[in-house]
């Protein structure tokens, strides 16, 4: 086998060679290097459209890689400290779902926090696994769910020793980290696999100034969003696995749902970004840390806002904090996060990652500059001056843990009927309701609808949150499980 090193980018290099050749395309895609769609060329550029190609012998095949894609995956595994890696072109949604489908079958139990991304619960709908939700602590001031607590996980393991796996969000969207190494050791001692949704942690492995990464903590699988903080194109992702997993079986699971027409634009972007991180990741992310800490200090100096950080660490529900996450509590100026989000975009042409009931998140990454930070800080100061109010009518909590009545799969495939939000109180939900982003369900199939949850949904609607998941696009009605007593 030829020797590989991190200076190489096999897919990128193959694409460069392809561009130099004068191959006449009688294969798909039908735009034929852009000639059949000049408007697309005008939008994306000739160089981009010219390498939007399908699988061919010189370019390998993602479903069964034997050459350049295999080499690219080996380089990813080496760069991230994994036993094996997979290039994923269905976003980290596909990576998360592959983790669960690889470890759980119908009727199997999986231990996880309730504040998971919808992709995890969707995987439960697909495979029929039974969720064992861990109760989450909520920060009383900023209203966000915190990390998994070791004692609560230990109790769940003791109560459900037959569970197959534990899923951990690390870090959360807000930057909260659990005791990943301790939880991994605890789960392994009980014979359970450890799956980590590391969508927001592609950068963790590359500097010791950040929390421990999933692979470094000994996890069995990790879903990594390279496009979020690693520099690759949107929808590209990585799935990392440890030595305990069978890579051939995992590949079979991936191929159940993965496109057979994989995008070489996405794969090349993963290849290039991996090389960049392997060669310059430490330097790049330490610069990101400096920018984030500077922004945090400047925002807190405005007054009213609270850009939180490592002071949240209590070694119980918060064991570390990803300081690259610029999470800011906004209710101190009387505005919800979504209101600040909308003002930044509509009045200041600044697009942040998301706003929710109490917080905003500005994603700081390898592409940011000091002048961008200054513009954000200035806009936040201006918003406080022009738009702040008393905020007496705001809802404090960001997270409500629902009661699970039916498994997600049973509920999703049950006969349903549509009720108004108020009529649905007390019923069992038959669909998802969530603010997106971040895509964490307020309600999932199989959960009891309460007055508190309905009030939260109505408040989120009033304040401009983008609600998704329901058949009713206006979210005035919700599908509930149809039963005789209903």
Language-model regions, residue ranges each:
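Conserved C-terminal alpha-helix-loop-beta "cap" of PLP-dependent enzymes
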Residues: 294-469
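Charge-dense polyanion-binding interfaces
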Residues: 466-486
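Structural signal for conserved beta-strand scaffold positions within catalytic alpha/beta enzyme cores
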Residues: 87, 133-135, 224, 354, ...
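N-terminal "arm"/small-domain region of PLP-dependent enzymes with the aminotransferase-like
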Residues: 1-67
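Short, glycine-/Ser/Thr-/acidic-enriched flexible segments
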Residues: 33, 173, 228-229, 244-246, ...
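Conserved N-terminal alpha-helix of the aminotransferase class I/II PLP-enzyme fold
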Residues: 49-94
């Amino acid at each position: 086998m030829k020797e590989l090193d991190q200076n190489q980018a096999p897919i990128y290099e193959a694409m460069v060679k392809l561009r130099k050749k004068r191959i006449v395309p009688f294969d798909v895609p039908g735009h034929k290097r852009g000639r059949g769609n000049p408007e697309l060329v005008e939008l994306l550029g000739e160089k981009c459209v010219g390498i939007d190609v399908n699988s061919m012998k010189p370019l390998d095949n993602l479903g069964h890689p034997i050459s350049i894609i295999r080499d690219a995956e080996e380089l990813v595994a080496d760069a991230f400290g994994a036993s094996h890696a997979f290039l994923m072109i269905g976003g980290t949604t596909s990576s998360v779902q592959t983790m669960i489908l690889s470890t759980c079958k119908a009727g199997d139990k999986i231990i996880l926090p309730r504040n998971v991304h919808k992709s995890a619960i969707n995987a439960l709908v697909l495979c029929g696994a039974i969720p064992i939700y861990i109760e989450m602590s909520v920060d009383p001031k900023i209203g966000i769910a915190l990390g998994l607590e070791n004692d609560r996980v230990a109790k769940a393991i003791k109560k459900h020793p037959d569970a197959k796996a534990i899923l951990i969000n690390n870090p959360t969207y807000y930057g909260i980290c659990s005791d990943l190494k301790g939880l991994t050791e605890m789960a392994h001692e009980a014979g359970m696999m450890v799956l980590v949704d590391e969508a927001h942690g592609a950068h963790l492995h590359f500097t010791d100034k950040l929390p421990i990464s999933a692979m470094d903590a000994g996890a069995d699988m990790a879903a990594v969003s390279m496009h979020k903080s690693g520099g690759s194109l949107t929808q590209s992702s990585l799935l990392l696995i440890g030595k305990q997993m069978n890579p051939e079986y995992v590949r079979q699971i991936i191929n159940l749902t993965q496109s057979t027409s994989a995008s070489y634009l996405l794969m090349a972007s993963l290849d290039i970004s991996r090389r960049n991180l392997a060669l310059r990741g430490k330097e790049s992310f330490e610069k990101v840390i400096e920018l984030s800490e500077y922004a945090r200090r400047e925002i807190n100096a405005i007054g009213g806002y609270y850009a939180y950080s490592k002071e949240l660490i209590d070694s119980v529900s918060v064991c570390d904090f990803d300081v690259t996450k610029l999470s800011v509590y906004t209710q101190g100026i009387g505005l919800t996060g979504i209101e600040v989000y909308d003002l930044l975009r509509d009045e200041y042409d600044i697009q942040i990652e998301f706003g929710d009931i109490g917080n905003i998140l500005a994603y700081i990454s390898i592409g940011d500059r000091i002048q961008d930070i200054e513009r954000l800080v200035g806009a936040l100061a201006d918003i406080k001056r022009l738009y702040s109010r008393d905020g007496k009518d705001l809802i404090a909590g960001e997270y409500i843990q629902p009661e699970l009545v039916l498994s997600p799969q049973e509920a999703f495939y049950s006969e349903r009927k549509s009720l108004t939000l108020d009529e649905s109180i007390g019923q069992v939900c038959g669909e998802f309701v969530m603010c997106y982003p971040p895509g964490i369900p307020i309600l999932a199939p199989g959960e009891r609808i309460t007055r508190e949850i309905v009030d939260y949904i109505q408040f989120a609607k009033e304040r401009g949150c983008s609600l998704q998941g329901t058949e009713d696009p206006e979210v005035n009605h919700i599908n509930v499980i149809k039963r005789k007593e209903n």
